[in-house]
Amino acid sequence: LAKCTGDASHFYCPANPLSLPASLTGLNAASLAATVLVDHATSMFAAPQKSVLPALAGPIGNANSFDWGLPFYYGRRVFMTIEGQTSAIGTGPVYAF
């Protein structure tokens, strides 16, 4: 993905909006297909009427990590257990939705 330049260099700036497939797989082998939307960050920053940027994306410095961002949570019930703590959904870290 093309990275932005200047002040937005920590974000992606693809020439056209992208809809990328992703797959989440749990330790129990359960999996879920998801979609990641990526759009031109600089263009989104220039639209001040938007308070949430659902297609904002950028690298976070580790190929083993991914930040889904706030839009992933819209319309979902998401449950989390803190690392080392036990709950009805297991010993953390656990993410369920």
Question: What does each model-identified segment do?
Answer:
Residues 13-17:
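Short coil-to-beta strand junction motifs in C2/discoidin
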Residues 18-29:
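Short conserved beta-strand and strand-loop elements enriched in small hydrophobics
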Residues 29-97:
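Aspartic protease catalytic domain
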Residues 1-12, 69:
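Aspartyl protease active-site motif detector
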